[in-house]
């Protein structure tokens, strides 16, 4: 006759394997998957900050080589133009000077930045450029030393403007590209070289910015 030991059976019953713990079934995503989610723009990703539209935070050398802090023009409406002496648009100097003379007492200023990136049409020295624009067009608005407005040596001022969102951003396409800056020092409009200084829409926009508080 076989005799069962109830104590052994009871002990065996208590050693049944436990089910897997809940926490093991709910493991978090592997770090690699989280990183991929962030890289693809997941909720933990952070967008790069937009470049500042304030562009008067630069010190430039004027046409005579003297350091000029652009912050001095804050409070004015500014038209920035990359100029050249041997360009088909060079005659715009005349219109720019007329516009400046007409509105300077209202708080408007033109800033000229000579550049030689387009067709090598500004080959002269700063002294040559000054003699040309003052002698030929009687320019009295502020002129600055020659800089690079595009390419590997692009000046930080134009690099900052190029980084702006469309339709303002991007390198100048040619000489006499124009950027309009409001009284707060923010670049607000872009005009291509074909836009003449007496263009009705350009003038209306300048008037609008001059009237703003």
Predicted feature locations:
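Thiol-/selenol-based redox modules, centered on thioredoxin-like
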Residues: 156-159, 163-213
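Bacterial N-terminal signal peptides
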Residues: 30-39
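Bacterial N-terminal signal peptides that target proteins for export
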Residues: 22-30
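Amphipathic alpha-helical repeat scaffolds
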Residues: 62, 82-86
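Structural microenvironment flanking redox-active thiols in thiol-disulfide oxidoreductases
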Residues: 89-155
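N-terminal "domain-start" segment that seeds a small globular fold
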Residues: 46-71, 156
């Amino acid at each position: 006759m076989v005799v069962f030991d109830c104590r052994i059976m009871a002990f065996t019953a208590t050693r049944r394997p436990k089910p897997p713990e809940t926490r093991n079934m709910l493991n978090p995503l592997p770090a690699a998957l989280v990183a991929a989610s962030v890289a693809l723009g997941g909720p933990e990703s952070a967008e790069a900050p937009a470049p500042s539209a304030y562009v008067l935070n630069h010190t430039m050398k004027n046409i005579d080589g003297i350091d000029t802090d652009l912050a001095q023009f804050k409070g004015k409406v500014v038209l920035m133009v990359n100029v050249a002496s041997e360009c088909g648009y060079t005659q715009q100097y005349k219109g720019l000077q007329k516009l400046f003379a007409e509105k300077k007492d209202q708080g408007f200023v033109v800033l000229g930045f000579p550049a030689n990136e387009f067709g090598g049409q500004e080959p002269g020295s700063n002294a040559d450029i000054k003699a040309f624009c003052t002698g030929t067009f009687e320019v009295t608005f502020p002129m600055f030393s020659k800089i690079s407005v595009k390419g590997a040596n692009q000046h930080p001022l134009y690099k900052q403007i190029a980084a702006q969102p469309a339709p303002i951003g991007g390198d100048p396409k040619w000489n006499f590209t124009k950027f309009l800056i409001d009284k707060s020092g923010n670049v607000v409009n872009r005009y291509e070289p074909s836009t003449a200084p007496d263009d009705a829409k350009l003038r209306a926009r300048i008037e609008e910015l001059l009237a703003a508080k």
